[in-house]
Design a protein with these regions (language model features):
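Helix-biased detector of long, well-ordered alpha-helical tracts
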Residues: 1-186
Length: 186
């Protein structure tokens, strides 16, 4: 399985992570949602003039740490400088191997349970809170879901489909699962 994604987040740093951790975890989790074991990542940075070197170092360190936690190797990278105001954008491509079942959206069945991995909305709430300078204890839950998915499989849980709810929210994901499988949610 192969997936690619671009990450543009403002602020670059937020409670619980930064754009580097988000890029690695997002790509790893996309592979996991297909039933693939993530193995390799590539990364390309687009860096606007004025970006802080210390921020780049922290972002790269977060990527390295997240890759190690997920058991993946970052095998290639690229950087491009562009005019701008210090923004940093990251594109990652991930490669993983499907050893068992491909968890395709079309495999959802009537009677399937919908299980979420944690509280909903923490990541976006943490980012929005930072943008709006709202003081609270909300922390992004950005993390590789390798152990969680491995435990589902190891414990014989019959998985038909998995999705990362990051983009579009739960309602969008449920609609996509229903459309792909020709079913509906009631």
């Amino acid at each position: 399985a192969v997936t690619t994604d671009s990450f543009v987040v403002n602020p670059l740093f937020f409670k619980g992570g930064n754009i580097g951790k988000l890029a690695v975890c997002g790509t790893v989790n996309d592979l996991l949602m297909r039933g693939a074991t993530p193995k390799y990542l590539t990364s390309a940075f687009i860096i606007e003039e004025g970006a802080e070197l210390n921020e780049l170092k922290l972002i790269a360190a977060a990527m390295s740490s997240a890759a190690k936690e997920a058991g993946v190797i970052i095998v290639a990278g690229d950087t491009k400088d562009i005019e701008g105001n210090g923004g940093i954008y990251i594109n990652t491509t991930g490669v993983g191997f499907i050893e068992g079942e491909d968890f395709a959206s079309a495999k959802s069945e009537i009677g399937d349970a919908v299980i979420v991995s944690g509280s909903m909305g923490d990541h976006h709430a943490a980012i929005l809170s930072h943008r709006m300078n709202i003081k609270n204890d909300i922390t992004s839950d950005v993390a590789p879901l390798c152990d969680m998915v491995a435990n589902l499989i190891k414990n014989g849980i019959e998985v038909h489909a998995m999705r990362d709810v990051t983009r579009g929210g739960l309602g969008t994901v449920l609609n996509e699962l229903a459309d792909a499988s020709g079913k509906c949610f009631e």
